[in-house]
Amino acid sequence: MSKYRIAWMPGDGVGNDVMDAAKIVLDAMNFDAEYIPADIGWEFWCKEGDPLPQRTIDILKDTDCALFGAITSKPRDEAHDELAPELQDKGLVYFSPIVKLRQMFNLHTNLRPCKAYPGNPLNFRDDIDLVVFRENTEGMYGGVEFFPLPESVYDALCENPRMKKWKDVGLENVALSTRIMSVGGCESICNQAFDYANTHGRKSVTLLEKPNVLRETGGLMTRIFRAV
């Protein structure tokens, strides 16, 4: 029996090529794993109305980890138009399977190394060596949106006097995306960034935020960052 069970999710397009290359590397290392095929991506949205079928979620819950390639993601109207004809009157709405996975399994930290290697003619600068920590599940990734804007939501938002100006525009002409941030979410990603810096000998941690404009959400993140 293999030491690890890994959900294998090529997804769409270049994802298949990326996963083929990954398998070559894993096999060359004699990595002891069983790879379980799992469906995800545009094909399953078009055919089934769900880019992340429940059977895939069940596989993910029963494996040690997952390897994922890439997915296609399109705007709402295009996504609807590409559904199978028998699904187009079912009221289905496309939601990114990657965002859904992040929220479902609390995969809130996206870690992106960025390093320049000597001899690469495409280097912007030869001394670049940084790691980006990006929040995956909160902020705009919460996915809480409205269009048109419901009267009940507008009334609640009128606790903030800046909201009243949008009434004159006509609520049927207003789209709203919410930036939801929690104390716990901010603390988690800040702690991970500082822990990484300490563990890997990094000399500084920099926060990218806009608290002078996004005073509540940006301000919350900035205060927590400084406290950590």
Regions found by a protein language model. Give the residues of each.
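Basic/polar N-terminal segments that are highly enriched at the extreme N-terminus
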Residues: 1-3
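A short beta-strand-loop structural module common to alpha/beta enzyme folds
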Residues: 32-44
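Generic secondary-structure signature for well-ordered alpha-helical cores
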Residues: 27, 31, 62-65, 103-110, ...
